[in-house]
C-alpha cells in the first residue's frame, strides 16, 4: 500500500528560473511566475509548505499588455484623509516595473505568511542585467 508523502521544509530543492518578459503578455507571464513561486509545477507540491523556486524576471519594462489595460489604475492609500493615490499601468511599467509585477503576483499567491515568503523569492529587473548569474549557473 502506498501513502502520499508530504514534503518537509528542509527537504525542498529550490531552482532558479530566469524569465525574459520582453514581448510577452503581462497576465499570462504573471500566472506562470505565480505557479513557479508556489511550487505547483513540482510532483511533491505540498500546500502548507513553501516548496516554490526562485524567479528572476528580466526586461520587465518591455512587457506587453493587451486591450486597453494601459489605462488600468492601481490605487493605494497613504493613511491620511483624502489620501487615495492612483497610478496607471503604463506609468507604473515605465517608472517601477518591480512594483507592477509584485502587485500582480501577490494577488495570485496566498494572503498569509507563506504567501509573503513566496513573494520574496521573486526578483524583477527592468533591463537584461541581473546580479543572480552565479545562482542561475548553479542549476
Swiss-Prot record:
Protein family (similarity comment): Belongs to the universal ribosomal protein uL13 family.
Pfam family, one: Ribosomal_L13
Its biological purpose: This protein is one of the early assembly proteins of the 50S ribosomal subunit, although it is not seen to bind rRNA by itself. It is important during the early stages of 50S assembly.
GO BP: negative regulation of translation; translation
HAMAP family (alphabetical): Ribosomal_uL13 (MF_01366)
InterPro entries, A to Z: Ribosomal_uL13 (IPR005822), Ribosomal_uL13_bac-type (IPR005823), Ribosomal_uL13_sf (IPR036899)
Gene Ontology CC annotation, any one: cytosolic large ribosomal subunit
Name this protein carries in UniProt: Large ribosomal subunit protein uL13
Keywords: Ribonucleoprotein, Ribosomal protein
GO molecular function: mRNA binding; structural constituent of ribosome
SUPFAM superfamilies xrefs: Ribosomal protein L13
Top-level division of the source organism's lineage: Bacteria
Assembly notes: Part of the 50S ribosomal subunit.
Amino acid at each position: 500500500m502506498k501513502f502520499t508523502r508530504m514534503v518537509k521544509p528542509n527537504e525542498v530543492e529550490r531552482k532558479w528560473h530566469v524569465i525574459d518578459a520582453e514581448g510577452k503578455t503581462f497576465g499570462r507571464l504573471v500566472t506562470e511566475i505565480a505557479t513557479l513561486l508556489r511550487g505547483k509545477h513540482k510532483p511533491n507540491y505540498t500546500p502548507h509548505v513553501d516548496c516554490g523556486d526562485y524567479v528572476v524576471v528580466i526586461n520587465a519594462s518591455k512587457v506587453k499588455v493587451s486591450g486597453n489595460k494601459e489605462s488600468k489604475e492601481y490605487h493605494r492609500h497613504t493613511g491620511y484623509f483624502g489620501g487615495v493615490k492612483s497610478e496607471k499601468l503604463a506609468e507604473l511599467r515605465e517608472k517601477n516595473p518591480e512594483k507592477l509585477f509584485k502587485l500582480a503576483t501577490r494577488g495570485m499567491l496566498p494572503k498569509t505568511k507563506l504567501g509573503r515568503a513566496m513573494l520574496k523569492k521573486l526578483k524583477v529587473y527592468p533591463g537584461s542585467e541581473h546580479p543572480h548569474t552565479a545562482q542561475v549557473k548553479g542549476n
